[in-house]
A protein has these predicted regions:
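Bacterial N-terminal signal peptides
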Residues: 7-17
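Short, mixed charged/polar active-site loops
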Residues: 63-68, 92-94, 110-112, 175-177, ...
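Sec/Tat signal peptide C-region and signal peptidase I cleavage site
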Residues: 18-26
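Glycine-rich, pocket-lining loop/helix-strand segments that form or immediately flank
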Residues: 107-139
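A mature extracytoplasmic/lumenal domain signature
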Residues: 52-56, 77, 87-91, 99-101, ...
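N-terminal mature ectodomain segment of secretory-pathway/periplasmic proteins
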Residues: 29-104
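Gly/Pro-enriched, hydrophobic low-complexity segments
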Residues: 28, 33, 103, 113-115, ...
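Positively charged n-region of N-terminal signal peptides that target proteins for export
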Residues: 1-5
């Protein structure tokens, strides 16, 4: 299940003096505003480039593992998400994600690992794709119970945090909650957090984001040496 971190990356307060009824109305109004921004951005979104920081927290030993690099996202058609992560620190690796297929290239050992998650985890993969860049509010609400978190600033950019609880029992058992920070300016997620049972979580933050309409397919493809060593860990 660790591989699902790659596809995911791999996402204010209501005044206590208000009555519960008016507070619910205000929260709903703010959530609808987030949905509106997402729905306006979704049909126009074709791709982006950004710097990425991915943090994986293991609570039992209070340990954080941080990967730093860049990401390129390409969406040639709805629900067709292609991504390339190029991590430079602390260990160099490049991750290509296309649908349910994942490739991880380790240049130090000249090894690429191939994973096909579609056969055994098709439903989970489809859920994760709905968390991807350029999703609309209907995609999210079909698969998640969505509530308002509140306004926050991520990398100097104003955003609104929303919380998502999976409707699928299988996904809920593995990842009980997700959080997305949706840019108030672009309607695109600038931070994503994925919780696991207990207090472990994975957090991906995107900065220096450029929304681009014409990402070439070559920009989301691994450029592998001819003599690369190929492994299939799931076989």
């Amino acid at each position: 299940m660790r591989l699902f971190h790659l596809t995911f990356v791999l996402c204010g307060t209501v005044a206590l003096a208000w009555s519960p009824h008016s507070g619910a109305q205000a929260a709903d109004s703010s959530l609808q505003a987030v949905f509106k921004r997402m729905d306006e951005a979704s049909p126009k979104f074709k791709g982006l480039k950004a710097d990425v920081k991915k943090l994986a927290h293991v609570d039992v030993i209070n340990d954080d593992t941080v990967d730093i690099g860049t990401i390129v996202v390409r969406v040639p058609k709805p629900h067709d998400l292609q991504m390339l992560f190029d991590f430079k620190q602390p260990d160099q690796k490049t991750v290509q994600i296309e649908g349910a297929k994942v490739q991880i290239y380790y240049p130090k050992t000249n090894t690429v690992q191939d994973y096909d998650l579609g056969k055994n985890h098709k439903a989970q993969v489809e859920q994760f794709l709905k968390l991807g860049f350029g999703s609309n509010s209907r995609d999210l609400q079909d698969s998640f119970a969505v509530t308002l978190g509140g306004p926050e600033t991520i990398g100097g950019e104003s955003a609104t945090r929303i919380e998502l609880i999976p409707k699928s029992k299988d996904l809920l058992a593995t990842f009980p909650k997700f959080e997305l920070w949706i840019s108030d300016k672009t309607g695109i997620s600038v931070q994503q957090k994925m919780y696991q049972p207990g207090k472990d979580y994975s957090l991906a933050t995107y900065t220096n984001m450029q929304i681009l309409p014409n990402i070439p397919e070559s920009a989301v493809k691994l450029n592998l040496p001819k003599n690369v060593n190929r492994e299939h860990p799931l076989k």
